[in-house]
Design a protein with these regions (language model features):
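Iron-associated oxidoreductase/ferritin-like identity signal
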Residues: 1-64
Length: 64
């Protein structure tokens, strides 16, 4: 299970980096797309924090 959680965290980090690049590239060019991607980025950051919490719980319980 820990392997899956770490994989999700890694995938979320990749998505965060990808969306951050889109935000930079659309700055001053396409505010509608930028606003949409900012909202998506917030979701991805929340997902990452959630799974980091799951990982901490597994580690605390000695399941990691």
């Amino acid at each position: 299970m820990v392997h899956v959680i770490k994989g999700v965290i890694e995938a979320e980090q990749g998505a965060i980096e990808y969306y951050s690049r889109i935000i930079e590239e659309t700055d001053g060019i396409d505010p509608v797309t930028q606003d949409m991607v900012i909202a998506i980025l917030r979701d991805e950051q929340g997902h990452k924090r959630l799974f980091e919490g799951f990982l901490r719980e597994y580690e605390k319980e000695g399941l990691a």
